[in-house]
A protein has these predicted regions:
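C-terminal motif of bacterial Sec signal peptides marking the signal peptidase cleavage site
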Residues: 9-12
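A short, structured loop/turn motif at beta-sheet edges
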Residues: 62-70, 91-98, 119-121
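Bacterial signal peptide processing site
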Residues: 14-16
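N-terminal glycine/threonine-rich, aromatic-flanked beta-hairpin/loop signature
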Residues: 38-66
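Short, exposed beta-strand-loop hairpins at the edges of beta-sheets
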Residues: 52, 100-118
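Sec-dependent signal peptide recognition
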Residues: 1-6
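Tryptophan-anchored aromatic micro-motifs
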Residues: 20-36
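An anionic, turn-rich surface loop/hairpin at beta-sheet edges
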Residues: 73-96
């Protein structure tokens, strides 16, 4: 019984690592599914701009940091009504060279997606 108590106690004290400041700027890769196809994106982010490279397509978005682990992106040159909507990104966990995050259109809490970005520079 004491052993079970200790396991539960230590498990409840575990906090996922979140060194978000290490991933505020840099060059990253993110792989996701789009229309049943795997797409690899490379993006470069500084404190205020995110430049996303997908194939030969380049998208630029402004970045507004809410706190160390959360930011809002807005495309600077949206080509559709959907692209005009801001995207909220929250870093959930970090490790040595990557972070896991969730993202959604601002205000759409029902359709959150998750992904992992790897820092390459």
């Amino acid at each position: 019984m004491t052993c079970i108590f200790l396991v539960v106690l230590f498990a409840s004290c575990y906090n996922a690592e979140r060194n978000c400041e290490d991933f505020r700027t840099g060059t990253f890769e993110f792989t996701y599914m789009l229309d049943g196809k795997e797409v690899r994106s490379r993006f470069v982010r500084n404190d205020s701009i995110n430049i996303d490279y997908v194939g030969e397509h380049i998208d630029t978005a402004s970045v507004s940091w809410v706190n160390d682990c959360e930011f809002i992106m807005r495309k600077l040159h949206p080509s559709s009504m959907r692209e005009r909507k801001a995207v909220q990104v929250k870093i959930l966990t970090t490790d040595e060279n990557s972070y896991t995050f969730e993202y959604s259109i601002v205000g759409d809490n029902k359709n959150k997606q998750r992904g992992t970005a790897v820092k390459i520079e």
